[in-house]
Amino acid sequence: MSSARSFAARRGLYGGGVGLALLLASCATPPPARTLACSDALAPDIVRSADGTKASTTLKVLTFNIEGLGFPARSGRAAELKQIGDRLAAMRAAGTGPDVILFQEMFSGAAKNAVAASTYPAIASGPRRTTKASGPAPEALPGKAKLKRGEVGMHVTGSGLAIASRYPVLSTQMRAYGKRACAGIDCLANKGIMLARIAIPGVPTPVDIYDTHMNSKGASKAPEPRHLAAHDRQALEASEFIDSTHDDAFPVILGGDFNMRHSESRWENFSKYQSLNLVHRVCADQASGCEVRMSWDGDEPWMDTQDLQFFWDGSLTSIRPIRVEALFDGSPDSPQLSDHDGFMVTYRLEWPTSADQTPTC
C-alpha cells in the first residue's frame, strides 16, 4: 500500500476525500423550495358538533427518515428514493396521503428530487451547510474529537430536514445545533431543528410544526459518554428553540428522528427539557380513543423506535391524536424503501365556533 493510501486509511472512512465527495454531492442539487398562496389553498372538511358549539377537522402528519445519504455513505439508493417521491405523489393525488410530511436525511440529490417529486405545493428546508449555530459554545464534550470519525470542525452537508405541506406555510424558522452539540460522524451534517407555521383554511389559528434529527448512538462511531452528552445538548437546544418561537395560542407538533430507541438515558435527558405529550404514550392507552393501525410490542412502544411525534394544545385550538399507522413498512401496499418506516399520525383539531374566524393568512 502506498504512503498516500496508508494516510487515507488512517483518516478513516469519513475523513479526507470522502468528506469532499459528500460535500460535492450535497452541493450539486439545491433543496426544494415551494410556496403556496392562501388564495390557492383548498380547505379541509370541517365538522360541527351536534350542539353547534364546536368545530373540528383532521390533520395527518407523517415523519419519515428517507435514508437519503449520499455517496460514499450510501450508494444505489436512487431507485428507492424515486419510488418514495412517486408513491407520495400518488397518495396525494388519490386523497389518501398525509397533509404534512416531516422529512429527515434529505442529503443526496436523489433525496432532494424525491421530496420535490412528492408534488406538495409548499416545501421548506431546514438548516443549510453554512447555517451558523446560535448562542455561546458550551464546554467541550467528554473525550477528544477524532478526525477519523468525522469530527473535523466543519460540516459537509446541511441538516437534511424538510417540511412539505398541502397547506400554506406562513413562516419558517430554523436553528442549527451547536458545534459542541454533535458527536462522531453526525458532525458532518449540520443537524438542527426547524419550524413551519402552517395555516389551514377554516381553522382559527395556525399550527406550529417542528422537525428535527438528533445525534445517533453507535452509528456515530463516538464513545457513549460523548454521543450521550451531544444528544443531551441537542435536546436542550431544541427545547429552547421551541420556547422562543412557538406562539402559545397555536397547537404544536414536534416530530422527527430522535435517535432514542432502547436508550433509557437519552429518554431521561430528553424528558428533562421537553414536556410535550408523546403520541405513542397517549395512543398506547386503550381508553384514549386513538386507533392503532400498526404493530406495537410491550407497554412502552416508544422505546422501540427512533421516529416519534409529540403534541400540545393551543390556547384556542386543541389537538389530540386519533389514529397512528406505519407507511413504507413492508406491508403489501406500502413497500419498505428506507431503513426507517414512516410514522403517520392523524390529529383532530377542535375549536369553539364562537372563535374569531379572521383568516390566518
Predicted regions and their residues:
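Active-site-proximal segments of metal-dependent phosphoesterases and phosphodiesterases across multiple
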Residues: 214-238, 262-272
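Surface-exposed intrinsically disordered loops and tails
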Residues: 130-150, 179, 183, 227-229, ...
